[in-house]
């Protein structure tokens, strides 16, 4: 029914549409953002329908088709969160967050990709709560997990999430044994639209995910850093102060 997912057509159609609307709205950026949010919500309705239909008719659709649909859905989420991230302070609800619940939600969201790629998903939490915004923290961790899945090794892939307390901080580490990041690229991974050199031939990327979550972490008062050795591992480290609050 759906045929192949025409990613290039969707991408260029969206860019053309954004350019047209940007010219139309001119400097009224709030109207433009509102248009983008409405457009995205309308697009997500048929995508959700496609995902559901694929799940209910797995014999008709191969795994790669469903994977591409989920990837498209994630990219659209990325656009939505990028639009919202410019003035997220109005949307923050800082509370004590249960990390177990957050990670459970993320693992369920990515369950199909984890299973289809034979990725071992480990969670060992020494500390189970942090102060943050639940919705935005889920987005941040989900983006990191998506990167781990995209840049995995072909065999014996592992994603491991651990947490520990260190003086006045809670440290959450997300480790994978994927293709890693070249040393020369590590300083630029949070730059807008930057993609690592050893990942370009493996999978297409907007280069916006880490840029967005870095900005979000700054506003939430969290610290984020990355350690990596090419062809060995990548570790993303999130640090939460016990009294973290977001920054205006």
Mark where each language-model region is.
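Short helix-loop "hinge" at the ATP-lid/N-box region of the Bergerat-fold HATPase_c
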Residues: 148-152
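Conserved micro-motifs of the catalytic ATP-binding
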Residues: 88-92, 125, 129-132
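Short beta-strand/loop element within the Bergerat-fold HATPase_c
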Residues: 158-168
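Short conserved segment of the HATPase_c
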Residues: 181-193
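Acidic ATP/Mg2+-coordinating residue in the GHKL
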Residues: 176
């Amino acid at each position: 029914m759906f045929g192949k997912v025409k990613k290039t057509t969707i991408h260029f159609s969206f860019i053309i549409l954004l350019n047209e609307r940007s010219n139309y709205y001119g400097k009224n950026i709030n109207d433009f953002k509102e248009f983008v949010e409405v457009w995205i919500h309308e697009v997500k309705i048929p995508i959700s329908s496609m995902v559901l239909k694929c799940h209910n008719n797995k014999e008709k659709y191969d795994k790669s088709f469903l994977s591409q649909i989920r990837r498209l859905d994630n990219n659209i989420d990325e656009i939505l969160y990028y639009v919202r991230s410019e003035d997220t302070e109005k949307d923050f609800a800082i509370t004590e967050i249960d990390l177990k619940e957050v990670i459970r939600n993320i693992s369920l969201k990515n369950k199909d990709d984890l299973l289809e790629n034979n990725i071992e998903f480990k969670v060992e939490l020494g500390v189970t709560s942090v102060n943050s915004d639940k919705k935005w923290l889920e987005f941040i961790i989900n983006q990191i997990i998506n990167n781990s899945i995209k840049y995995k090794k072909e065999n014996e892939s592992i994603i491991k999430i651990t947490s520990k307390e260190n003086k006045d901080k809670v440290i959450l580490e997300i480790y994978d044994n994927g293709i890693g990041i070249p040393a020369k690229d590590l300083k630029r991974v949070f730059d807008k639209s930057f993609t690592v050199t050893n990942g370009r031939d493996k999978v297409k990327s907007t280069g916006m995910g880490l840029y967005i979550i870095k900005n979000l972490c700054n506003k939430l008062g969290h610290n984020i850093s990355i350690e990596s050795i090419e062809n060995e591992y990548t570790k993303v480290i999130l640090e939460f102060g016990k009294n973290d609050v977001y920054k205006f």
